[in-house]
A protein has these predicted regions:
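An extended, acidic
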Residues: 139-298
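General beta-strand structural signal in soluble alpha/beta enzymes
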Residues: 55-59, 84-86, 95-97, 116-117, ...
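Short basic, glycine-rich beta-strand/loop surfaces that mediate nucleic-acid
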Residues: 74-75, 104-107, 204-208
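Short, acidic/small-residue loops that bind anionic groups at enzyme active sites
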Residues: 109-110, 114-120, 187, 234-238
Length: 315
């Protein structure tokens, strides 16, 4: 896929504008309006591009419009054929309650190179590229994974830090990690950002694990791929409807453990713009009469950067 700086900047512009629109609802206790504002501007800006775009990960099916729905065509239809994954507001509760962690996220890849994930849960594990890829596995015990990381990092188990969503479903895992004396970083929401904390030692996270959204797993995998990190995911289907939908999307082995190169095939671009502050990027701010945004951007192995943009306040 021919990716150039102008195209990358176009997607940075899209998530930046979506973040700004959501930012206008920060602290207003209305996550639905924040999400809708981000969706509307994201659709508007995507349709301005000379691309033949198709949503493969969005916010629902066709009958749930005006969300960016799975299968929706975007762009002029005259340019390159690309798959698009979006999460216009990752952490809607963060935005509604003016808490850290709100992001606007998009990932793109050549047509059929971005996994079309069903709207269901995924068991995930991600580690830094400096840890051997065979050190952890979804099929290993928690204890074995942690001990292997400690050995690979040449540090005591008590110095290993694990990041996981603070959910009742994770009580057993959290208890086991605590028994091992592992340092914990518990997240109330936002498992895209959580997974990306393994990309750099400055975040002091050795492993991200646990059950979160399947679509969010694919979005995170796009960025993790650029950093050479390890990621595994296995979908969890709770209802017959989940299974039926997965099969219609081409998933045959319901227990399959997906490796990173099966989720992201070839080149991909990932962009996340902060709405509220997070470990990854700063949230939207206002300086004089302008909005200032900060975006976390990756493109395969060739481009990893934090980009700042300014936009005039028009209202």
């Amino acid at each position: 896929m021919l990716i150039n700086k102008d195209l990358i900047n176009s997607f940075v512009n899209i998530t930046s504008k979506a973040a700004i629109e959501a930012f206008k609802f920060v602290g207003m206790k209305n996550k639905i309006m924040a999400d809708k504002a981000a969706v509307d501007i994201m659709r508007e800006e995507l349709n301005k591009l000379d691309i033949d775009g198709k949503i493969v990960i969005g916010e629902g099916e066709l009958d749930e419009a005006p969300m960016l729905y799975i299968g929706e065509k975007l762009g002029s239809g005259k340019g390159m054929s690309i798959d698009i994954a979006v999460d216009p507001v990752e952490g809607t509760n963060f935005v509604a309650n003016n808490l850290p962690g709100g992001l606007s996220v998009i990932a793109i890849a050549e047509r059929d190179h971005l996994f079309n994930a069903p709207e269901t849960y995924m068991d995930k594990i991600a580690i830094n590229k400096n840890i051997p890829s065979d050190a952890v596995d979804l099929d290993n015990s928690i204890r074995d994974n942690i001990l292997n990381i400690a050995e690979a990092r040449n540090k005591d188990v008590s110095k290993v830090r694990a990041c996981i969503l603070d959910r009742p479903r994770h009580k057993r895992i959290i208890d086991e990690l605590s028994d091992l004396k592992v340092k914990l970083k518990l997240l109330s929401d936002g498992d895209i950002a959580g997974a990306l904390l393994v990309t750099d030692d400055k975040y002091d996270v050795d492993i991200f694990l646990g059950i979160g959204g399947g679509p969010e797993g694919v979005l995170a995998a796009s960025a993790l791929d650029a950093f050479g990190c390890k990621f595994q995911g296995r979908f969890i289907f709770e209802t017959e409807e989940d299974i039926k939908r997965a099969k219609t999307m081409g998933i045959k082995d319901l227990n399959k453990k997906y490796e990173l190169n099966e989720i992201i095939k070839g080149e991909s671009v990932f962009c996340a713009t902060g709405i509220t502050n997070s470990d990854l990027v700063k949230g939207v701010t206002t300086v004089n009469n302008e909005f200032v945004t900060e975006s976390f951007v990756t493109y395969k192995n060739s481009f990893k950067n934090v980009i700042n943009n300014t936009y005039p306040k028009l209202d």
